[in-house]
C-alpha cells in the first residue's frame, strides 16, 4: 500500500503540474505477502479495452515488474474497473506464471489513468529460472537433466501439457538408470494452475546425501560402468557378453545382502546391496553393452524379489543374480524352471527357450 501511495503521489504531482485533478479510484484488498521487490515498468502504457488490459498486465508479470502506470485511451473508467477485476482473477487463478508467482494485484483508477502494483510470493530470480519446454517429453528431458545434476529444485513452464505422474516417472527413470541417479529423492510437486494447456510444474528434490557427495558417488559409479563396457568382448555373442558382465559384477566382492539408499554406489563400491540393486545394475550394464535386459519385480517363495530377464540370441531367459551367487555361476532359466517365483506374466516377454544344459562331473 505504501508503495502504491507513493506512486499515486508522483502521478498526482504530475497531474497538478499539468493543471488537472485526480478522481477517487478503488483498489482490491491486500493480503500479507511473502516476497516483495521493486522494479517499475519505466514506461506508461496505453490500453483501450479488456484485451489490451490483460495483455499489459500479463506482460508485467512475465517480466517480474511490480509497478506500472497505464493511460485509459477512450476506455470508460467504470468499464476499466470491471475489466480489471476480471483480469486480476485471470492472472492469479488461470495465467500460469501468475498462478505460480503472484500474491496480490492492487490498482487505482481515475482521470484516465490506471496505477498498478503487483506483489509476488516468488522472487524475480525464481521467475527468471523458469524453463520453457514443450509437451511431456520436453518436461521429462528437463527432469532427467536436473536428476543428473543432483539439483534440489526445478520449475518448468510446459506447453501442450497433459497429465503425467512425475513422481512415478522419476522412480522409473532411477530404476532404469542406476548409473545416473545415485539416490532416489523425495519429490514434492506443485502444478499451477489446475487446468489449461500450459502449466507451471514446480519440483523440489530432497536428498539425504549432500549434492557434493552425490556427485562424488556419480563420478565413481560412472567409472565402474565404463570399466564394465571395456570388460566385454566387442564381437562376442550374447551368451558370452552376459557371462562376462556377470563375472565383472559378481567377482568384485563377497556381497552383503542389505538395502541401501544409494543402491548402485553401495553395491559397486562396498559390496552391499539387495536383489533390486543387483538386478538394476546388471540390467543397465547389459543395455550399455548392446544387450537387451530388463528388471523384473515379483516374489520368490512369497518374499519380495527382483531379478532380470535377458535376451540371448532369439530367446529370453530369467537370471536371478542372488540364486546365481549361491550356485557360483550364471544360470539362465525358462518360465517353466521358475518354481516358487511369481511375477506379472503379461508385463514381460515369455521365456520359452531351450532349458540350459548343465554340465556335470562324471562319476568315478
Region annotations inferred by a language model:
Residues 277-342:
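Hydrophobic/aromatic-rich core segments of domains that either
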Residues 267-276:
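Periplasmic OmpA-like peptidoglycan-binding domain that tethers envelope proteins to the cell wall
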Residues 21-234, 345-364:
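N-terminal accessory/pre-domain segments preceding catalytic cores
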Amino acid at each position: 500500500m505504501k508503495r502504491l501511495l507513493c506512486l499515486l503521489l508522483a502521478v498526482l504531482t504530475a497531474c497538478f503540474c499539468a493543471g488537472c485533478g485526480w478522481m477517487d479510484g478503488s483498489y482490491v484488498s491486500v493480503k500479507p505477502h511473502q516476497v516483495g521487490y521493486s522494479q517499475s515498468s519505466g514506461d506508461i502504457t496505453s490500453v483501450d479495452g479488456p484485451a489490451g488490459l490483460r495483455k499489459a498486465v500479463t506482460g508485467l508479470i512475465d517480466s517480474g515488474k511490480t509497478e506500472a502506470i497505464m493511460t485509459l485511451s477512450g476506455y470508460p473508467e467504470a468499464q476499466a474497473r470491471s475489466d480489471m477485476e476480471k483480469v486480476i482473477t485471470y492472472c492469479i487463478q488461470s495465467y500460469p506464471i501468475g498462478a505460480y508467482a503472484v500474491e496480490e494485484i492492487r490498482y487505482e483508477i481515475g482521470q484516465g489513468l490506471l496505477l498498478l502494483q503487483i506483489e509476488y510470493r516468488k522472487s524475480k530470480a525464481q521467475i527468471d529460472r523458469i524453463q520453457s519446454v514443450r509437451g511431456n517429453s520436453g518436461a521429462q528431458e528437463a527432469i532427467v537433466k536436473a536428476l543428473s545434476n543432483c539439483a534440489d529444485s526445478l520449475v518448468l513452464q510446459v506447453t501442450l501439457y497433459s497429465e503425467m505422474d512425475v513422481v512415478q516417472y522419476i522412480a522409473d527413470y532411477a530404476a532404469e538408470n542406476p548409473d545416473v541417479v545415485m539416490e532416489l529423492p523425495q519429490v514434492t510437486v506443485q502444478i499451477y494452475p489446475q487446468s489449461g494447456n500450459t502449466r507451471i510444474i514446480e519440483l523440489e528434490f530432497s536428498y539425504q546425501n549432500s549434492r557434493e557427495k552425490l556427485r562424488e558417488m556419480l563420478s565413481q559409479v560412472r567409472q565402474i560402468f565404463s570399466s564394465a563396457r571395456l570388460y566385454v568382448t566387442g564381437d562376442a555373442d550374447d551368451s558370452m557378453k552376459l557371462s562376462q558382465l556377470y563375472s565383472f559384477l559378481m567377482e568384485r566382492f563377497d556381497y552383503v545382502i542389505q538395502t541401501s539408499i544409494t543402491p548402485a554406489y553401495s553395491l559397486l563400491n562396498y559390496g552391499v546391496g539387495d536383489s533390486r540393486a543387483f538386478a538394476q545394475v546388471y540390467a543397465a550394464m547389459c543395455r550399455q553393452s548392446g544387450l537387451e535386459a530388463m528388471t523384473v519385480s515379483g516374489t520368490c517363495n512369497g518374499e519380495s524379489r527382483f531379478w532380470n530377464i535377458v535376451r540371448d540370441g532369439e530367446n529370453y531367459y530369467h537370471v536371478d543374480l542372488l540364486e546365481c551367487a549361491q550356485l557360483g555361476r550364471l544360470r539362465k532359466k525358462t518360465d517353466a524352471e521358475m518354481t516358487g517365483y511369481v511375477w506379472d506374466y503379461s508385463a514381460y516377454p515369455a521365456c520359452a527357450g531351450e532349458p540350459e544344459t548343465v554340465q556335470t562331473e562324471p562319476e568315478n
